[in-house]
C-alpha cells in the first residue's frame, strides 16, 4: 500500500481529501500543522506529500525543503496562491 501525507490546515478540506484518498485505496495521514507533519514523516514510510503552502506554524515551502534533506519524496502543493514559485 502507498501512503500519502496530507498537510493542510483547513480541517474540513483535510478530512475531505483524506476520505477521498482512503476510498481510492491509499493509506493516508492527515495533519494540520507543519511540526506534526514532520513527526509523521519521520515515523512512517511516506510515498507522497500533499502540502498546503500557508500553515499556522510555517510555510509549506520550508517544510518541503526540510523533507528533501531527509529523502526524496514527491510533493504536490495545495494552494490558492496566484504566483508560481520554484523550490
What are these regions (language model features)?
Residues 1-87:
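N-terminal/domain-start alpha-helical segments
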Amino acid at each position: 500500500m502507498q501512503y500519502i501525507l496530507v498537510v493542510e490546515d483547513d480541517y474540513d478540506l483535510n478530512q475531505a481529501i483524506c476520505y477521498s484518498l482512503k476510498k481510492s485505496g491509499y493509506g493516508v495521514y492527515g495533519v494540520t500543522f507543519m511540526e506534526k507533519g514532520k513527526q509523521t514523516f519521520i515515523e512512517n514510510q511516506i510515498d507522497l506529500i500533499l502540502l498546503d503552502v500557508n500553515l499556522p506554524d510555517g510555510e509549506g515551502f520550508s517544510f518541503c525543503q526540510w523533507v528533501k534533506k531527509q529523502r526524496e519524496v514527491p510533493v504536490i502543493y495545495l494552494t490558492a496562491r496566484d504566483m508560481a514559485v520554484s523550490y
